[in-house]
């Protein structure tokens, strides 16, 4: 879909649903309801780093400043890019064609709220009265182009109960800066107030807006602003640094919930929207390992919790992700949702709760599954646990052992590996690629226990799982090491980077997006904004020496050593606060030294081994993901150029 439509879909989802952390591709998990992923960071380092001389051979080492090292990496990347300009342009043109072909699958979403319908048109948020919706009588409520905010994107929208105000959350595409803009709706909408650093917000009454403030990537305070009296007041403060606070209004608008969540535990407080000035009331005190969410209807609280045994629901064989469509009319008896897979564009369904009837609403020329096979496998890990794998390949492919294979892994925070639809996946399938998704421990595919068995002192389980998955794929004839590439992002970089050190012979190349590669130094620095919050995932090496040694045993940065490495391509934003550039420069610096040391010490039998490419692509700005559709397209084109080149593949199709 077009960028503006894509953002509007997410915005309106947030309008009526839980606050979804801004990720590249959100999906609804079917087993455990854990907190949306909060990204992480690596440790800054001193303004000097040891790097090798830029000459061809191994030279004496010298000190480089941070700026010198960054300049050196930018020069190296520019040289790589200039060598493959034609390849990159061909791939970009093909990508654009695929994006345009599948962007029209999801039309502009129209949401009914009370007597109005709200929708996006030409980058503006608009509304019409229900009786005038077909007559073209449209009010433009909000247009970012009229505001002095450069490179800001709309993240969230809330409409006041009487439709007199609209609160719009915006976030910079190049940093963590955010704000809430409150517009008074009249014949000529007027900006009533701008509140900086706002993360989440909800209307309790026609005039009272509750909101959270984000400081150093953390939300721990809740305020309200009374537009009738023009005053604000602090309502709630979370004292525990492991917890992140957001707001949600129940679908019947009776209660506003203050949700304080850590990686494994939650606590919910209620504010009665009929009496918004009364103190919040706790639902249930936090219990370690229990996450819960509260809804309300007809004087009953409905609590969705992870306490107890999970329940699984079967989907069609091809489906890999499920996303609920927002529906403000909570009394509706019809539920709308989307099913998709990495190679199947989203298909819209309607389910009647009264008639127990499922209707497919999306028209398809021909199901993708006809030309693409999905295979479900299980690999036996080191401790004999069976690990699921999902593989996609072209239906008529032969000699699969000689086809390129791109393996995806994540394995952290109880979050599933991303299996949402991406147009570039279809292009890869057309070119004969196979796509494999490894559902390793540490993720959430098989529930909370699956996550717990792959975090803190069990992180090695996820690494062993990944190794077992790759070995099984090769054993069954799905490609071979010389045609295998590994891809991950953010915290998934821990497992990918660990395998890169422990079993480099299993892959030919690796592509990482804003990866977390220095776990130990990050978790040893309590002054970084998210270190305390991350302790439930990685442990606390500050007070536990055994934890420190355990992290050191798998940390990608700590375990770089002279050996034959696969080629690697890393993308990072220059001002990314969650994964600072300085940490990745240090990683690249150490990796280059290990590669050079190994080249110098190679035996006669090893002289024929090709030197790996080590490339760092530093993007401007501070976004943890690509800041725009064009940026994303360019990044994917360059990353695919790297993969096609490293695996010796032709880009001319």
Residue ranges of predicted features:
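Generic beta-strand/beta-sheet core signal
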Residues: 183, 212, 259, 271, ...
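A structural signal for short secondary-structure junctions
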Residues: 295, 308-309, 327-331, 342-343, ...
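Beta-propeller folds
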Residues: 2-317, 418, 422, 603, ...
């Amino acid at each position: 879909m077009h960028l503006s439509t894509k953002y509007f879909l997410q915005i309106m989802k947030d309008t009526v649903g839980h606050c979804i952390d801004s990720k590249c591709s959100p999906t609804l998990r079917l087993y455990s309801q854990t907190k949306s992923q909060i990204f992480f960071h690596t440790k800054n380092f001193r303004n000097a780093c040891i790097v090798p001389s830029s000459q061809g051979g191994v030279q004496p080492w010298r000190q480089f400043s941070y700026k010198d090292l960054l300049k050196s990496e930018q020069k190296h990347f520019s040289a790589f890019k200039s060598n493959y300009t034609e390849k990159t342009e061909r791939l970009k043109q093909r990508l654009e064609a695929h994006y345009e072909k599948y962007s029209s699958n999801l039309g502009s979403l129209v949401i009914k709220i009370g007597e109005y319908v709200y929708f996006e048109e030409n980058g503006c948020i608009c509304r019409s009265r229900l009786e005038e919706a077909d007559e073209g009588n449209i009010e433009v409520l909000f247009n970012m182009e009229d505001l002095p905010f450069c490179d800001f994107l709309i993240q969230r929208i809330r409409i006041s109960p009487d439709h007199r105000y609209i609160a719009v959350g915006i976030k910079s595409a190049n940093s963590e800066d955010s704000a809430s803009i409150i517009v008074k709706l009249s014949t000529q909408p007027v900006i009533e107030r701008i509140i900086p650093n706002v993360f989440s917000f909800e209307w309790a009454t026609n005039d009272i807006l509750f909101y959270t403030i984000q400081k150093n990537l953390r939300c721990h305070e809740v305020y309200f602003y009374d537009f009738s009296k023009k005053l604000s007041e602090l309502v709630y403060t979370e004292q525990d640094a492991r917890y992140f606070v957001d707001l949600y209004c129940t679908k019947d608008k009776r209660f506003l919930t203050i949700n304080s969540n850590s990686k494994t535990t939650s606590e919910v407080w209620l504010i009665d929207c009929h009496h918004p000035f009364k103190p919040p009331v706790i639902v249930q005190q936090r219990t370690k390992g229990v996450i819960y969410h509260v809804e309300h209807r007809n004087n009953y609280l409905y609590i969705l919790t992870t306490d107890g045994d999970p329940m699984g629901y079967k989907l069609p064989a091809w489906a890999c992700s499920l996303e609920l469509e927002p529906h403000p009319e909570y009394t509706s008896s019809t539920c709308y949702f989307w099913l998709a897979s990495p190679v199947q564009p989203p298909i819209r369904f309607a389910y009647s709760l009264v008639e127990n009837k499922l209707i497919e609403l999306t028209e398809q020329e021909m199901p993708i599954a006809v030309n693409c096979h999905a295979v479900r496998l299980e690999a036996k890990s080191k401790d004999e646990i069976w690990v699921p794998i999902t593989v996609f390949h072209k239906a008529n492919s032969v000699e699969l052992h000689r086809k390129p294979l791109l393996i995806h892994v994540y394995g952290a925070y109880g979050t599933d590996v991303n299996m949402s639809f991406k147009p570039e996946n279809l292009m890869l399938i057309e070119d004969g690629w196979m796509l494999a998704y490894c559902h390793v421990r540490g993720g959430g595919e098989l529930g909370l226990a699956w996550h717990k068995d792959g975090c803190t002192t069990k992180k090695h389980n996820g690494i062993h799982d990944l190794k077992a998955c790759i070995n099984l794929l090769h054993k069954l004839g799905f490609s071979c090491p010389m045609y295998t590439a590994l891809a991950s992002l953010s915290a998934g970089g821990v497992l990918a980077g660990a395998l890169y050190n422990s079993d480099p012979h299993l892959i030919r190349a690796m592509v990482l997006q804003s990866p977390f590669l220095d776990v130990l130094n990050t978790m040893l620095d309590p002054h970084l904004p998210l270190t305390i919050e991350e302790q439930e995932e990685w442990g606390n090496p500050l007070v536990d020496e055994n934890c420190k040694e355990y992290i050191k045993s798998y940390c990608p940065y700590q375990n770089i050593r002279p050996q034959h490495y696969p080629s690697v391509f890393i993308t990072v934003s220059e001002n990314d606060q969650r994964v600072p550039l300085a940490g990745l420069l240090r990683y690249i610096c150490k990796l280059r030294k290990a590669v050079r040391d190994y080249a110098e010490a190679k035996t006669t039998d090893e002289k024929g081994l090709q030197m790996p490419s080590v490339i760092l692509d530093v993007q401007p700005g501070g976004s943890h993901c690509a800041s725009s559709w064009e940026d994303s397209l360019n990044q994917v084109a360059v990353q695919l150029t790297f993969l096609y080149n490293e695996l010796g593949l032709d880009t001319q199709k």
